[in-house]
Amino acid sequence: MAEITTKQTNLKKVSEKYNELIKQKSGKCSKILFLVSDGKLIEKIKSSININSYIEEPQILTYISFIMKELEKYWTLISKELKSVKGVPNNIPYSLPEYIITEMVENFRYKYGYFEDITGTSENISKSIYSNLRSAAYMNTDIYSTGEKIYYTKKNKDNLERFSYTQNDEIIKEYTDKLIEKSAIDLPMAIYLYTEKLLKKEEYQKSLSKRYDYLIIDSIEKTSNAELELVKVFEKMGKETFVYGNISGDITSIYNFDLDNIVEHYSKEDELASNKLENKNLANHQRYGAKYKDLIPFSNRIKECYQSQLYNEMIEDILYKSEEIAKDSKKIGKTAIIIPPGSGILLHRITDALQKRGIKYFSTITDYKISQYRYANLLIIIAALYAGNSEIEFSTEEYIQMISLILGINKIKANKIFRENETLLKSTILENSELDKIYAESREITFDNFLGNIENENSEIDIKDINNSVENVHNLDRIIEKIYIGRKKNLKRSEFMRRFYTEVLITLEDGIENIEICKKVITECEKLEEAAECGIIKDFEIDKILKAYSKDYIGFRELKNSEGNDKLMITTPFYYINSLSERGIQLWADCGNNMWNPKIAKEINNSIVLRKSYEEKQIFTDLDEEKLKKYYMNNLLYSLLDSAEEVYTFKSDYSLNGYLSESMMYTSIINLMDREEI
């Protein structure tokens, strides 16, 4: 049964169905597979269940969590076919795919002349290739022909070099072969292997049939084509499926989903006959989702449009409004500042100013690399020095900042200490035998006595005792000392980082406040160490990946702990919509920025044409681009306004870079306020 509404999905209704099925199964809730669109919903659903009504652990999972567990449990069913060398798959960290593919692009580009007519950097090409792979996996289309498909939809394909698109597919093949060889999986490979390999095995389908009697899906609009294949298997096995959803605001572009294909499957049921898809021409499709007329009832929720000439003036307007709201303690916890994606500078300026003005906030935005945080970068530098990694270079400024933090001194003094001790500090890249001598000489004691003290197996190494036994210990010896001792103990890089944090950084002025970001660096390092042990990367590459590719992320528990009724929320439109937030006061920042509604077709990337519902080799025209952008803008506005009580918009005539700032977003807002057709 599929229940598709044109209103917000009622979580209570879905939970009631779940409770009803639990009663039917006499509390055996493990027989019910409940797939939710977001992990944040799991706790809400569990809290709605009568704890006395079930006798087993509820199987409430996201689709990704479910397939990851299934792959780990049933890996042996597909490992022989894949010629995998290990019995259990290794999940690689999110930072690794971009690094591996960028390295491949660099190699193929300069060694074999690949991507000759592509103007982007190797890193940008890598992002496009990985985006194509991810989209194809979600769309359940051939992951090895994404470049070819995109090429044939280009309006100017006759003037393009086809090889640049087939080379996209070669890189994907090279990348996936490398992962499979090492029994490693990332997100798109997990989706692909589960859907194309494991789910098609008769033995696995029998296992599913034995374990589950029901399937519940809470959100059809956030269901991928790959997830639909699981639904089809349940239907084929004669199991009951219950699918709920809301197609009033089509935001599937955010999720790489294909609502056309999903609705077409369910439209075969009688109650959905009216949704039967007929016209597959993108330029004409407006079958569901919000129309402009659906926005009109919300127009009175936009209370004021602040327009300034300069970018800095716009920021001041945002801060002025934030201060005004913050005066009312009841309002601040109901307020969200929503900024377009990729606005790191705007985010930094707003958060910096809020902090100075004493306004509490929490941010869900993770545009920053981990290394952009001072304490995190300090740990990365220390880890590289500990590993003796000569393959990575840090700037003088980074060393000075590290010394300034550890010693609690200003940068002028830190610079002086660095200049005086640069050789000693950088000597950590030397072999242990050479470091032994430098370390001993710096304390004016004999090498033999010192080494004997360190290597005495019958006594526990006590850093304080060592410090007390040496005269004239230099401030920087604290760093060198821990590196030396860590090496003698043969500690892993991540374990050394953990000890350095707990023994040194946590004692510093802001040490405790930086626990979370330091934990993230250490956790990321542990995952990269596992990847190195599998042979996916070399050990010396760990430091480079940590510095250049590892991104900040916000865990659900961390976000929950940071939220509060006394804090402003700073977020992006897509995160806000997906978070089911109930903040009725919204401040839309930088509405002249086109990232509110970004370009769909890029040089070698276009997720739309990778959809199953997109006709093969159909040219993606400028008209398609404009109509879809307008379509998604209407749906974005609908989804934001639907949860709003008061909206304040902010725009500057000139962008951060000094260009005239105009966007479809702002035009839509003005027309909506004037109730004009757009």
Model-derived segments and spans:
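Conserved motor-region signature of P-loop NTPase helicases/translocases
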Residues: 1-46, 225, 229, 246-389
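Accessory N-terminal region flanking or inserted into the helicase ATPase core
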Residues: 1-6, 103-216, 225, 305-310
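Conserved P-loop NTPase-based nucleic-acid remodeling module centered on helicase motor cores
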Residues: 29-137
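Structural recognition of the conserved hydrophobic beta-strand(s) that form the central parallel beta-sheet
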Residues: 34-36, 60, 239-246, 649
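ATPase/helicase motor core of nucleic-acid motors
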Residues: 329-481
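Accessory C-terminal helicase-associated subdomains
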Residues: 440-573, 580-582, 645
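A short beta-strand element within the Helicase C-terminal
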Residues: 570, 579-596
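C-terminal accessory regions
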Residues: 589-670
